[in-house]
């Protein structure tokens, strides 16, 4: 199996129907990201098995990267936990195990063994799914090992899981790996994951196999280049908007965030905002509806079951700050214990940028427009 992404053709029909429309949407106007695909390819060629994880803030393009990858590699297994109704472990196991059976074990038709496996899958309890997934992975690993003894090209089993952080943790025991992902992997078996920033001690994964993490935040120059390519490609049918200065200003306003960028470009394309002000971080007086809905989902996740007084105090400080603040600085401003502040920041880590400034880790919201949107919520007024 070729490990590098192909520009064409694009296939989505080999994946479950509930993911096909999403894959088509995420690969539309796709541009760049070669540095990510190169890293994936290098990992696959350097290791006989393993986990490769793409980490990035909301909207930075993780889902599109994975969608492009699996669309160009239809033998991959694909799952997206962010799709409505697909964030529980039992849903994941049912979908992935079915794909494994259909794509790798049922090549010769519905044999009695395949019928037996599908019957077992239908009658599995969610907590039994872990061993069944491991069983299928081992069977396929053995099959690939035998096949590659005579084949010139070494085929790999690649399972791609998007939005790992969207899992409903209540759907499985807290001591288990997210989605019951296996601790050990057989030869030629790989998982490619995408997730938002997380604390290492709360990764939800205990694995003893080769692994690598690529954090998109560590590649600002490459991200900027891809953003510019995306803008130019999107606006190629609107010559009056493709001037270099406009593209550069739009790229700067996007802060390399593709969700923000795609929504703004859509609004520009629909000419619904002729008064775009590139001097402002939000570009328009009002956010496009799609972006506002995206931020609303962030807000619901941040609020959880409710905000404490400390939560609100930290939130107000972060909303008012246009630069990063350290834990000690926040502590001095709101007169609260640093430990309590750290707990709040840890809970919101997926929506924050953390960077070292003057020897201290400073925190800010991942995008200026999200910070501004939060500042307009009634709870902060």
Pin down the residues of each PLM region.
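P-loop NTPase Walker A phosphate-binding motif
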Residues: 50-81, 98, 195-207
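Conserved small helical "lid"/interfacial subdomain of P-loop NTPases
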Residues: 216-245, 288-299, 377
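C-terminal leucine-rich, beta-strand-based interaction scaffolds used for sensing/assembly
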Residues: 60, 65-68, 297, 311, ...
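Winged-helix-like regulatory helical subdomains adjacent to P-loop NTPase cores
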Residues: 25-27, 34, 280-333, 359, ...
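Amphipathic alpha-helical "lid/sensor" segments that cap RecA-like P-loop NTPase cores
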Residues: 8, 200, 243-289, 312-313, ...
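Mid-core helix/loop region of P-loop NTP-binding domains shared across ATPases and GTPases
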Residues: 112-161, 184, 242, 246-253, ...
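Walker A/P-loop-proximal flanking segment of P-loop NTPase domains
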Residues: 3-60, 64-69, 149-150, 170-171, ...
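Conserved Walker B catalytic segment
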Residues: 145, 152, 156-194, 339-343
